[in-house]
């Protein structure tokens, strides 16, 4: 996929530093090539800028250790005229060991040195400025910061330097700049102090959860500021609330569909019911009518099949395992029966459903994800996107996304309880991740409007967020970036995507989807018409042109032997029937009083549900 954008990274050592690693991870996240130049002699400075085989440079990063080998006037000014005159520059990894005159020379006196904070709490905060053009959804926020050493920048001209990030400690008014933007002859130049959690930077950068996100926040902000639409970016901000287990009866325990609809209209959010297929023929007409009349507020996805405990557990168990084994062929049979039942549900109610699997109790092993792919599911969404028994993906960029294709080339997404911290929501919005919440009916025990506060927080944090069904979110689960020719590259996650051209001109999308071609592809269609595609290594490639202000649907259909009409959808298993009755009794009667709700809260929070109903 040729996009023609790259980051010029100038270093002075062959050993990768923490700051260099963070830039490389950030570039990988945004789909930018890194053109590395080793500066060990001032005479070689300019040859990297004019090499004919280099792509268009959209950002320049210089490690502070390389400054002695870089003539700042030559690199930042004279050497970057023409195509590179306005390219933003980041000087990163600044520590007290960097000579002050090198910093002062490179910054024209804006940054004159660095020091280490003395007596700074290990739980200090990293305050982010309100400069939304740089900080986006993180504007004005405070990130947890647990660095082993906290270096900061000495700013010489405080009036004309924009402090983007600074350390602060509780109980004091002191501020320590760590990420600064200055303007040098019309060019944006950023300076960042070294940021790391541990001496082992490889381990430190393997996961950027919120306690470590401050490490990479600066490079990510810089790269997106410098490269703009040439970075991989999502096509919108999406959010969803999923409620697990209910069938369509009014009320279902503490969940009143009529009441919830009023709250959704008031607070502006969308609810997906993770529907147990066993309940396919139990829906009440009143609730069915409510769903059919309000598709912008209600939707249905698939929640297992029978929901008999950990329904998609290990294929083989060992002594001490909590649940019985569920061999792969049994799990595939459950997937087939779930689809057969959902097709019956669709015929009986006239309500469509999304082929998005929410596994009961926990995500299945990886090979089951291949089964979902074979039966043309869009994605799976669970509290954790790593399959049972699988290790975390080694790629650092995977830890910045809530979706991974690492397992069977099938999209697996994270979701969170409503207790997810606001800063975590903001980080996901900044990264372009969908905001997916889930709850059970007892969440509404005290108030049917219990979710409104969370919805308000998300809507206020990102006014352009769209609350959609899990299916709609999956169909918009792709990244795009601007090409040199004005068209777009697309990195697809799901096998069903909606391309929306919001421009006033025709746009061609060059689509790549990581693909193992197992299971085999039956066909690819664009707006229901067969479309040719290419195979290149482990990728499916196709090109789609979309007229101005129009959209087109791309669908990849995989081969399988499913004939929904021939699937046995009967409820002949007495054990499952008893279990479902007991579960309904728990949800619809026990949980509707204070004592029952207290038990229900303990039931889920303690993990007792993994042992019982």
Residue ranges: model-predicted function:
Residues 84-85, 91-105, 109-118, 270-369, ...:
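Metal-dependent polysaccharide deacetylase catalytic core of the NodB/CE4 family, i.e.
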Residues 117, 470-473, 480-613:
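C-terminal beta-sandwich/jelly-roll accessory domains of carbohydrate-active enzymes
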Residues 206-299, 354:
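Active-site beta->alpha N-cap acidic-glycine motif
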Residues 12, 16-98:
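Helical hinge/lid and interdomain linker segments adjacent to catalytic or ligand-binding clefts
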Residues 4-7, 26-29, 56-57, 120, ...:
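A glycine-centered loop/beta-turn motif at secondary-structure junctions
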Residues 226-255, 264, 329-333, 344-358, ...:
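Catalytic grooves of carbohydrate-active enzymes
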Residues 34-36, 218-220, 224-235, 262-279, ...:
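C-terminal domain-boundary segment and adjacent tail
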Residues 67-139:
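A glycine-rich, often tryptophan-bearing local segment used as a flexible ligand/cofactor-contacting loop or short
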């Amino acid at each position: 996929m040729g996009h023609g954008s790259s980051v010029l990274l100038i270093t002075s050592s062959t050993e990768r530093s923490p700051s260099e690693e963070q830039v490389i991870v950030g570039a990988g996240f945004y789909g930018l090539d890194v053109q590395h130049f080793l500066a060990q002699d001032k005479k070689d400075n300019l040859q990297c800028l004019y090499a004919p085989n280099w792509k268009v440079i959209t950002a320049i990063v210089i490690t502070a250790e390389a400054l002695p080998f870089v003539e700042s006037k030559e690199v930042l000014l004279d050497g970057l005229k023409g195509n590179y005159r306005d390219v933003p520059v980041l000087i990163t990894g600044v520590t007290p060991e960097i000579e002050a005159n090198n910093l002062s020379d490179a910054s024209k006196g804006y940054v004159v040195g660095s020091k280490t904070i003395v007596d700074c709490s290990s739980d200090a905060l990293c305050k982010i400025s309100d400069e939304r053009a740089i900080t986006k959804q993180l504007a004005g926020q405070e990130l947890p910061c647990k660095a082993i050493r906290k270096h900061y920048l000495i700013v010489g001209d405080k009036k004309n330097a924009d402090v983007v990030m600074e350390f602060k400690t509780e109980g004091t008014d002191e501020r320590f700049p760590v990420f600064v933007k200055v303007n040098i002859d019309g060019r944006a130049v950023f300076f960042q102090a070294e940021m790391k959690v541990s001496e082992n930077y490889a381990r430190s950068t393997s996961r950027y959860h919120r306690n470590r996100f401050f490490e990479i926040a600066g490079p990510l902000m810089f790269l997106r500021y410098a490269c703009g639409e040439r970075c991989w970016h999502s096509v919108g901000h999406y959010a969803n609330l999923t409620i697990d287990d209910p069938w369509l009866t009014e009320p279902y325990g503490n969940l009143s569909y009529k009441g919830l609809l009023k709250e959704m209209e008031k607070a502006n959010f969308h609810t997906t019911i993770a529907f147990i297929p066993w309940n396919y023929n139990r829906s009440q007409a009143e609730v069915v009518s409510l769903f059919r009349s309000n598709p912008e507020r209600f939707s249905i996805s698939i929640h297992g099949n029978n929901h008999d405990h950990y329904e998609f557990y290990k294929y083989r168990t060992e002594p001490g395992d909590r649940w019985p084994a569920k061999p792969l062929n049994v799990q595939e049979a459950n997937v087939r029966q779930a689809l057969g039942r959902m097709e019956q549900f669709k015929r009986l109610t006239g309500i469509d459903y999304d082929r998005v699997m929410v596994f009961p109790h926990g995500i299945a092993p990886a090979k089951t994800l291949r089964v979902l792919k074979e039966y043309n599911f869009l994605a799976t969404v669970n509290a954790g996107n790593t399959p049972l028994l699988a290790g975390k993906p080694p790629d650092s960029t995977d830890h910045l996304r809530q979706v991974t294709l690492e397992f069977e080339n099938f999209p697996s997404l994270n979701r969170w309880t409503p207790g997810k911290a606001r800063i975590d929501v903001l980080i996901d919005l900044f990264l372009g991740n969908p905001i997916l919440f889930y709850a059970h009916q007892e969440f509404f025990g005290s108030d049917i409007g219990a979710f409104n506060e969370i919805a308000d927080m998300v809507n206020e944090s990102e006014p352009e967020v769209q609350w959609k069904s899990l299916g709609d979110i999956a169909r918009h689960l792709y990244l795009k970036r601007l090409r040199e020719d004005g068209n777009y590259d697309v990195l697809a996650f799901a096998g069903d995507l909606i391309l929306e051209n919001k421009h006033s001109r025709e746009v061609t999308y060059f689509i790549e989807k990581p693909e193992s071609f197992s299971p085999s592809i039956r066909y690819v269609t664009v707006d229901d018409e067969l479309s040719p595609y290419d195979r290149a290594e482990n990728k499916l490639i196709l090109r789609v042109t979309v007229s101005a202000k129009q959209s087109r649907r791309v669908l990849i259909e995989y081969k399988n032997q499913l004939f929904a009409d021939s699937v046995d959808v009967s409820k002949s298993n007495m054990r499952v029937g008893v279990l479902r009755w007991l579960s309904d009794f728990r949800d619809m009667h026990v949980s509707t009083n204070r004592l029952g709700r207290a038990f229900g809260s303990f039931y889920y929070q303690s993990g007792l549900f993994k042992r019982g109903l």
